[in-house]
């Protein structure tokens, strides 16, 4: 079995000089968690396998600040770095990779123009392109016979709807079908975030995580809802994820990455210590 990856996620807002890491619940009510470069250094030293930076302001004025944050981080950190947020052009990808990122994460731009995945994968390689999918449960299955219906923990049937613009806009697109299409177009990984779970500390959304892990051949990164090491264990054991992304439990010092990895190792999950 391949080693499972632990990936801290840093949601970076560029509303002040140098950027700031924040964390909210269901993408709102943001509270500050620290300087992105300092946090990245800490996670690197603590044994993180990779890092994800998401520019959640992702505005035109913010792009240069983000490039600066990436360059400063790449000087200090020597594990793979994925950067996402508002990336919608080949030139933006080129700038971010040149600044020191190893991968980029595309989300809204890919939903609006799926060929963007193929174009960027053809130019930079599938290993550089992560398709981020934000999704919400939708229990209206009667009017959606063409959707992939899953059974929730309590037995309720539901499908998962792709949402874009940081969770603010529903698309009517089925998350399972979209993930399969992203793989076909050349995405090297899927970063799956449950909007229902984001910031709730209630655990990953297992039904959708497991479904994508079973249906796709590329790695699935589970995201949204981690409150303790048990949730990460369940993401691997029940959700079959290849990697676990978490934010709050690391940013505010509740658990160290090393503690989480020891917990997983004791439960026979292969991790890099």
Swiss-Prot record:
Active-site residues, as the UniProt record annotates them: 11, 134
Chief location bin: cytoplasm
GO cellular component: cytoplasm
Keywords noted in UniProt: Amino-acid biosynthesis, Cytoplasm, Histidine biosynthesis, Lyase
InterPro entries: Aldolase_TIM (IPR013785), His_biosynth (IPR006062), HisF (IPR004651), IGPS_HisA/HisF (IPR050064), RibuloseP-bd_barrel (IPR011060)
Pathway: Amino-acid biosynthesis; L-histidine biosynthesis; L-histidine from 5-phospho-alpha-D-ribose 1-diphosphate: step 5/9
Gene3D superfamilies: Aldolase class I
GO molecular-function term, one example from the UniProt record: lyase activity
GO BP of this protein: L-histidine biosynthetic process
Highest taxon in the source lineage: Archaea
EC number: 4.3.2.10
Assembly notes: Heterodimer of HisH and HisF.
Similarity comment text for this entry: Belongs to the HisA/HisF family.
HAMAP family with a match to the protein in the record: HisF
Protein name: Imidazole glycerol phosphate synthase subunit HisF
